[in-house]
Amino acid sequence: MKSRRVVITGLGMLCPVGNKVESAWEALKSGRSGIETLSAFDTSSFTTHFGGTIKNFDVSETMPLKDAKRMDIFMQYGIAAGAEAFADSGLDVDQLNPERAGVSVGTGIGGLRNIEETSLLIDRSGPRKISPFFVPGAICNMISGNLSIRYNLQGPNLSVTTACTTGTHNIGVAAGLIANGQADVMLAGGAEMATTPVGLGGFCAARALSTRNDDPSSASRPWDADRDGFVLSDGAGVLVLEEHDHAVARGAKIYAELVGFGMSGDAFHMTSPPEGGRGAALCMQNALQSAGLNPEDIAYVNAHGTSTLAGDIAETSAIKSVFGAHSTALAVSSTKSMIGHLLGASGAVEAIVTILSLRDQLLTPTINLDSSAEGCDLDYVPHTARDAKLSYALSNSFGFGGTNGSLIFARYS
């Protein structure tokens, strides 16, 4: 990020506590949980009966119903978040140089519900009943494709898929394209809709999910001694990234500056982090180096914080390794405590939360943290939000396959 400056000029988000950025932000500041018993299908035979879903979503606000019927819900969510972000940015399609504007929005899994329903259709009625829109309505890059068509974005058009790090990686890659001069404007982020029978069943089989069925709202409890797994959730987050001078020239509202991006690989295990979190530590170190910052410059970490036994302690250990004595002065909190794990969307949604924390100088809480687990002894902002003085904040995402990403944002003035 040492060449052209990259700023954030638009935000769009759907998550289990709100279908727009500001409504979700108000809920997160108040520490409200969006986790509930799932009702779209019968979960009685599953070990987990709950998750985080999008409530009262009206796709007709974003696109004609005939178009929506041709695509999986994860695409609908991603396009809705992209539309909110584009409108929020104040960009004018007619004034935008289309060859200098692009999109990088991904998903961790893709059109899972569409695939499930089409598989059932084949069993019931045979292959001739498959919709001609099945493939373009399910594949991972089609949020980017649809947003590109919608806004005539003729620049870079891509979609990074890296499990739970998807949103973060798409933002970082898009920022790099602006920084190195290949684009002036990029829409970037991630979307997911995996609270389906196969999605829930797959994560149950992996024993990754909490089974606190008697009290879903307290199930996501990062760093708590009684945590027992993550909560599967849906949503989308899209940011408008823009070259600084381009944004200033058109009088854009600037939320924050993206100053650092780091990546790493655990090279250890498909689903578990290495003891001590060395991959996560390297990722944060790379982000700091990219930003040209010292560990002491960071005041807040929006953690990956999934509420898993191994993941929470590994991230805590990694933070201690990177920040040393300064780790005791850091504020660290988990958005997932309130909205669960949005998989490929989580990094983008949490980046938005980090940006709004910088804007409002406020830390969102880690709810359900009643008794910290052994070795989890940082300031996790338990239970309630609080004011803070923030100049730089870091957001972490770590995914299956050992894929890691960290973003550093600076308060803009």
Cite the ranges covered by each PLM segment.
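ACP-dependent fatty acid/polyketide chain-elongation machinery
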Residues: 1-67, 89, 245-257, 352-366, ...
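Flexible, low-complexity linker/loop segments at domain and module junctions
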Residues: 1-8, 93-98, 291-297, 328, ...
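Condensing-enzyme catalytic core mediating Claisen C-C bond formation in acyl metabolism
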Residues: 5-9, 36, 214-291, 300
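Conserved beta-ketoacyl condensing-enzyme motif
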Residues: 8, 29-162, 191-202, 295-311
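Active-site-adjacent elements of ketosynthase-type condensing enzymes
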Residues: 47-53, 110-114, 193-220, 262-282, ...
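Active-site-proximal alpha-helical scaffold in enzymes
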Residues: 78-91, 140-144, 148-192, 230-252, ...
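Phosphate/pyrophosphate-binding loops at sites that engage ATP/ADP/AMP, CoA/4′-phosphopantetheine
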Residues: 85-97, 247-254, 284-300, 322-326
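Glycine-/small-residue-rich "gating" segment that lines the acyl/pantetheine channel
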Residues: 124-131, 172, 176, 185, ...
